[in-house]
């Protein structure tokens, strides 16, 4: 009986070490990719695990196509089932990294998420994927999770996807400070560049192809 117990304990230590390495890696990459302190004061405490289309596991800092990121992803972090969270996705490089005049573009915002159950949260902005303009180069995208003090009353009204108001120039720091959320408890960063799906999404959202 001792050997299986020791084996399980050893596996537990390995999993813990890998988790700590992942958490440290996402903090390092966010600093290297100039998220800290350009966009956030502090990095997330842990790596947010992101899976798109049930097949694509997001690796921090890697580049993916808008086609791969078109549907709302599944998220996983060390959530307290008794707590409420805010989940958001932003692009700080709109319309491009050299001239981010729309920083940050809000792609997703769900508040009052109980534990990991995003479907039971309150959507302020439904998810829509990356929209990097053609010839704009690579853009950064962040998905962040903040722990709320409790279930909160938010002033923000639900945003229409077809209306840029509220989506452009979204200030993450201002929003999270307003509701006293502190630093993100989990987060991840990835990149994307234009592909043929962008005109299709632009036409769906705004009635224009580019």
Curated annotation (Swiss-Prot):
GO terms for cellular component: extracellular region. Keywords: Secreted, Signal. CDD domains: PEBP_euk. InterPro entries: PEBP, PEBP-like_sf, PEBP_euk, Phosphatidylethanolamine-bd_CS. Residues 1-19 form the signal peptide. Gene3D superfamilies: PEBP-like. It is found in: Secreted. Cells at the bases of a few scattered sensilla on the posterior surface of the antenna. Disulfide bonds: none annotated. Its main location: secreted. Belongs to the phosphatidylethanolamine-binding protein family. This is Putative odorant-binding protein A5. It comes from Drosophila melanogaster.
């Amino acid at each position: 009986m001792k050997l299986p117990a020791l084996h399980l304990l050893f596996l537990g230590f390995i999993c813990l070490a890998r988790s700590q390495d992942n958490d440290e890696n996402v903090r390092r990459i966010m600093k290297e990719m100039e998220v800290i302190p350009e966009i956030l004061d502090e990095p997330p405490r842990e790596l947010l695990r992101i899976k798109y289309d049930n097949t694509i596991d997001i690796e921090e800092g890697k580049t993916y196509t808008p086609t791969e990121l078109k549907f709302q992803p599944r998220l996983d972090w060390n959530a307290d089932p008794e707590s409420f969270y805010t989940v958001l996705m932003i692009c700080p490089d709109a319309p491009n990294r050299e001239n981010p005049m729309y920083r940050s573009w809000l792609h997703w915002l769900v508040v009052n998420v109980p534990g990991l159950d995003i479907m039971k949260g309150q959507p302020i902005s439904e998810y829509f994927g990356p929209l990097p303009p053609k010839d704009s180069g690579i853009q950064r995208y962040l998905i962040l999770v903040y722990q709320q003090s409790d279930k909160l009353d938010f002033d923000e009204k639900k945003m229409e996807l077809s209306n840029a108001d509220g989506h452009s120039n979204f200030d993450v720091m201002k929003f999270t400070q307003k509701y006293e959320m502190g630093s993100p408890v989990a987060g991840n960063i990835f990149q994307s560049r234009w592909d043929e799906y962008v005109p299709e999404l632009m036409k769906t959202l705004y009635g224009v192809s580019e």
